[in-house]
Curated annotation (Swiss-Prot):
GO molecular function: lipid binding; proton-transporting ATP synthase activity, rotational mechanism
Transmembrane segments: 4-24, 57-77
Pfam families reported for this sequence: ATP-synt_C (PF00137)
Assigned protein family: Belongs to the ATPase C chain family.
Residues the UniProt record annotates as site (Reversibly protonated during proton transport): E61
Membrane association type: Multi-pass membrane protein
Lineage of the species this protein comes from: Bacteria, Bacillati, Actinomycetota, Actinomycetes, Mycobacteriales
Domain of life: Bacteria
Quaternary structure (record): F-type ATPases have 2 components, F(1) - the catalytic core - and F(0) - the membrane proton channel. F(1) has five subunits: alpha(3), beta(3), gamma(1), delta(1), epsilon(1). F(0) has three main subunits: a(1), b(2) and c(10-14). The alpha and beta chains form an alternating ring which encloses part of the gamma chain. F(1) is attached to F(0) by a central stalk formed by the gamma and epsilon chains, while a peripheral stalk is formed by the delta and b chains.
Any further remark recorded for this protein: Dicyclohexylcarbodiimide (DCDD) binding to the active glutamate residue inhibits ATPase in vitro.
Protein name: ATP synthase subunit c
Gene responsible for this protein: atpE
GO cellular component: plasma membrane; proton-transporting ATP synthase complex; proton-transporting two-sector ATPase complex, proton-transporting domain
CDD domains in UniProt: ATP-synt_Fo_c_ATPE
Length: 81
């Protein structure tokens, strides 16, 4: 395998994971912010706010794991000569 292709695949995979981690962190933070502000406004609505929060966090983390799969495809499926 050409070393330039391997280096490019590893750098690209690292950038993919960095972007996914940053996006997941921002998404989880925004969902947590909405949860805390909603509970601060209406403490009695806490039980109703947790379900959408966990669904949102689950979807954000699912997107991160899809990103992980694309990174693995990008890094480990490089052409071999």
């Amino acid at each position: 395998m050409d070393p330039m292709i391997a280096q490019g695949a590893l750098i690209g995979g690292g950038l993919i994971m960095a972007g996914g981690a940053i996006g997941a962190g921002i998404g989880d933070g925004m969902a947590g912010n909405a949860l805390v502000s909603g509970i601060a406004r209406q403490p009695e609505a806490q039980s109703r706010l947790f379900t959408p929060f966990f669904i949102t966090v689950g979807l954000v983390e699912a997107a991160y794991f899809i990103n992980l799969a694309f990174m693995a495809l990008f890094v480990f499926a490089t052409p071999v000569k």
